[in-house]
């Protein structure tokens, strides 16, 4: 056997920004065919630009040329590491100083606070800073609202509130007239703006402000415009459907916009305010009206807190402490950079869990109210973190065969339903409520996709449709970490995302350009490492004559891709390479065992090196295995030999325990296990369940394209689903075993699930995106 080039796995390669190599050996692939020098058409619908990049790849093997191409485009890794370090430091500070959450101010809510009269009876506002804040922030066209996203609903509701405030106190007349002119000229745009962009409770608070404006004698506004009358009519009908006694008895979603509801008994409503901060559903405007009617000290304390924190202004909703912590964690995880912030994320989720209730959570702590969006996100993240989460929390949102988003409101939100769908996938055995939630959310989202109705009423993001289509195609079982990151880098809106409350607003801890920049740097650095490792994998393939076992380069690429998409960190190169090579060696050993007729003892002798190895494929297979084991010293080498010996023994008995072998070798290589761990009852349970699932998934993968009875396929799919739920329970629940050990089993099983259920043409696309396509 030819000598194999040595790859020093303890050293990570410099960061490189590569072009697609002109010559890279990826034969037997639908988009790279080694048998022909002609460019092959893609099986998947790439965009034209991507097709041209792929077409640059040719099938001839020229490892040195690839290496030259990689390093000719290299960016000094010291510079990249410095950029990563700077952004990590920034994000760590952002997360550790989150407090009640970061959100921009709202002209609408600030205007409502300005209406509070002087406590000593003078004809002036109690908080004059609010009027100055309003005057200083008028936009050039005379409106107030989000300066980067011109939406009629947002601009008009903010501007109308500010005009009412300035007119009430007869200040800044020029600014006020400019605002009135804007309203007069732009109110008609409400007819043209899609209703999905309507701010929350617009049909309730808009008529209330119009009434105030009319009472103040602002005669220049188009009160009788048809669209204005229509909106007022819709608001009246909505209020007529909700009995005021219900609002006074329990917290409903309408409490968030209570400033738009007349003739409420505010003394009775006081019992519904949040005890800790004195607000009504964390809404400054609603709390202002409550204070005006009751002079409640807790409401006043909340208002003063906001003015102090937001420099004389107020946001649309506050606090947003739970919301910020949950969504920040989600973004960092999906972007593939959460490992930099493990301690911070642990603290964030511990904080959320401390405020968890039997009905879930709202955007802020200590609320008597809950919504399905925050509850779904919190349930999923906390369950994965190891907290004991009761799935029955979702019964609070179940109404017949549907799930509602907010109390008293039917859920029509794509993003909230999508988060419910994501949470429902983390089902443990026997959790029927999550099965119901999954079916409902899956049907809702599929219908939305089919009708191209994926615009959302809580957030404006250009990438929501693509994100949800991808999420429907790739469940979390099959969505390997680096595949998820490669796509979410496309879907993450960063500062492009705009959130919808009663006005538009932005949240720095959720939508942050630094997250994206860090994710691009990290992905590119890891990808450069993976490309170098792939070069060495090809050298290893050639040197060990792997081809003679019927194993193609496409098989080699797929094996390495699965490892790199699951264990992607640069510092885990040894585990990644061991995973990929072990998978190939399993195929090599199985190949010659199918032909070898010797006894079990004879075959074991091959493994231990004590027998006559003979010539040809048998010699190559065993020599390759011995070479792999020889790269490790001492106790690790002995553990690996024992693992392979156990695998070979089971193989001879007709049990293909590849999943257990891969998980155990990875755990051994990572230094996470010893003999006591390997003999632990839970470790054995994980091994047995992993073997069962991987066996069934391998059969499903082998049956792709075959004529299999639907009943048989459905039965096997159902068994896999039940076993995956059991595995999730073993992995996520707290136990004596380290989480990292259990996570390895899950990582291996997910690659089998991916291979079984993802179409070949999709796999080709994923391999290209993860290993070869530059990001950013």
From Swiss-Prot:
Q: Which reaction does it catalyse?
A: peregrinol diphosphate = (2E,6E,10E)-geranylgeranyl diphosphate + H2O
Query: Keywords, A to Z?
Result: Chloroplast, Lyase, Magnesium, Metal-binding, Plastid, Transit peptide
Under the heading InterPro entries, the entry gives: Isoprenoid_synthase_dom_sf, Terpene_synth_N, Terpene_synth_N_sf, Terpene_synthase-like, Terpenoid_cyclase/PrenylTrfase
**Single Gene Ontology BP term?**
gibberellin biosynthetic process
Q: What is its main location?
A: plastid
Cofactor(s) for this UniProt protein: Mg(2+)
The transit peptide of this chain lies at 1-17
Location(s) in or outside the cell: Plastid, Chloroplast
Q: Which GO terms describe its molecular function?
A: magnesium ion binding; peregrinol diphosphate synthase activity; terpene synthase activity
Q: Which GO terms describe its cellular component?
A: chloroplast
- Coiled-coil segments: none
Which residues participate in Mg(2+) binding?
371, 373
Report whether Lyase shows up as a keyword of the record: yes
Query: Under which name does UniProt file this protein?
Result: Peregrinol diphosphate synthase CPS1, chloroplastic
Question: What organism does the record attribute this protein to?
Answer: Marrubium vulgare (White horehound)
């Amino acid at each position: 056997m030819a000598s194999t080039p040595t790859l020093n796995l303890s050293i990570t390669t410099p960061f490189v920004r590569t072009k697609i190599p002109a010559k890279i050996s990826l034969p037997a692939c639908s988009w790279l065919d080694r048998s022909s020098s002609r460019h092959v058409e893609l099986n998947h619908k790439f965009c034209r630009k991507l097709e041209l990049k792929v077409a640059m790849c040719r099938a001839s093997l020229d490892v040195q040329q690839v290496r030259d191409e990689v390093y000719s485009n290299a960016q000094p890794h010291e510079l990249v590491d410095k950029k990563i370090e700077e952004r990590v430091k920034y994000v760590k500070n952002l997360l550790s100083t989150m407090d009640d959450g970061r959100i921009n101010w709202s002209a609408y809510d600030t205007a409502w606070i300005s209406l509070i009269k002087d406590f000593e009876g003078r004809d002036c506002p109690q908080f004059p800073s609010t009027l100055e804040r309003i005057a200083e922030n008028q936009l050039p066209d005379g409106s107030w609202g989000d300066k980067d996203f011109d939406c009629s609903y947002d601009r008009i509701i903010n501007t109308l509130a500010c005009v009412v405030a300035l007119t009430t106190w007869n200040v800044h007349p020029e600014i006020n007239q400019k605002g009135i002119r804007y309203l007069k000229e732009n109110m008609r745009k409400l007819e043209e703006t899609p209703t999905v962009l309507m701010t929350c409770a617009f049909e309730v608070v808009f008529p209330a402000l119009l009434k105030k404006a009319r009472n103040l004698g602002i005669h220049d506004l188009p009160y009788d415009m048809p669209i204005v009358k229509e909106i007022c009519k819709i608001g009246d009908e909505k209020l007529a459907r909700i009995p005021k006694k219900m609002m006074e008895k329990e917290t409903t979603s309408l409490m968030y916009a209570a400033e738009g509801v007349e003739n409420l008994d505010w003394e009775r409503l006081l019992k519904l305010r949040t005890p800790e901060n004195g607000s009504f559903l964390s809404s400054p405007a609603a709390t202002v009206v409550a204070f005006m009617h009751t002079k409640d000290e807790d409401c006043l304390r909340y208002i003063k807190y906001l003015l102090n924190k937001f420099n004389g202004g107020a946001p649309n909703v506050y606090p947003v402490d739970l919301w910020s912590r949950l969504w920040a964690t989600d973004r960092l995880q999906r972007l593939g950079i959460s490992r930099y912030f493990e301690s911070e994320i642990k603290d964030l989720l511990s904080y959320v869990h401390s405020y968890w209730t039997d009905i879930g959570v709202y955007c802020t702590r200590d609320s008597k109210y809950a919504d399905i969006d925050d509850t779904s996100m919190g349930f999923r993240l906390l369950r994965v973190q190891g907290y004991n989460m009761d799935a029955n929390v979702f019964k609070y949102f179940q109404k017949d065969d549907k799930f509602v988003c907010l109390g008293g409101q039917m859920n029509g939100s794509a993003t909230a339903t999508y988060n419910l769908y994501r949470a429902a996938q983390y089902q443990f055995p026997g959790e029927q409520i999550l099965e119901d939630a999954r079916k409902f959310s899956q049907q809702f989202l599929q219908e939305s996709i089919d009708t191209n109705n994926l615009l959302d009423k809580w957030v404006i993001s250009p990438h929501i449709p693509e994100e949800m289509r991808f999420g429907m195609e790739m469940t979390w079982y099959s969505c390997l970490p680096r595949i998820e990151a490669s796509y979410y880098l496309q879907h993450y809106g960063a500062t492009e995302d705009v959130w919808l409350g009663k006005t538009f607003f932005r949240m720095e801890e959720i939508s942050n350009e630094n997250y994206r920049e860090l994710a691009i740097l990290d992905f590119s650095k890891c990808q450069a490492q993976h490309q170098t490792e792939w070069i060495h994998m090809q050298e290893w393939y050639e040197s060990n004559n792997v081809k003679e076992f019927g194993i193609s380069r496409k098989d080699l690429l797929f094996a390495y891709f699965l490892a790199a998409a699951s264990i992607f960190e640069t510092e885990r190169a040894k585990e990644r390479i061991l995973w990929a090579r072990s998978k190939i060696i399993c195929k090599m050993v199985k190949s010659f065992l199918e032909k070898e007729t010797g006894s079990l003892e004879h075959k074991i002798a091959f493994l231990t090196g004590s027998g006559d190895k003979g010539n040809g494929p048998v010699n190559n297979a065993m020599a390759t295995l011995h070479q792999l084991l020889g790269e490790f010293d001492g106790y690790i080498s002995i553990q690996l030999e024992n693992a392979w010996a156990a695998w070979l023994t089971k193989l001879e008995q007709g049990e293909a325990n590849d999943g257990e072998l891969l998980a155990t070798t990875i755990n051994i290589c990572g230094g996470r296990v010893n003999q006591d761990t390997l003999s632990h009852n839970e470790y054995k349970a994980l091994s047995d369940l992993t073997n069962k699932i991987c066996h069934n998934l391998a059969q499903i993968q082998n049956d792709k394209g075959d004529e299999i009875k639907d009943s048989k396929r459905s039965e096997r799919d159902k068994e896999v689903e039940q076993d995956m739920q059991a595995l999730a329970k073993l992995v996520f629940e707290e136990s004596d075993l380290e989480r990292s050990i259990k996570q390895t089993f899950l990582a291996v099983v997910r690659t089998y699930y991916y291979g079984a259920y993802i179409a070949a043409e999709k796999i080709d696309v994923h391999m290209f995106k993860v290993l070869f396509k530059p990001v950013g």
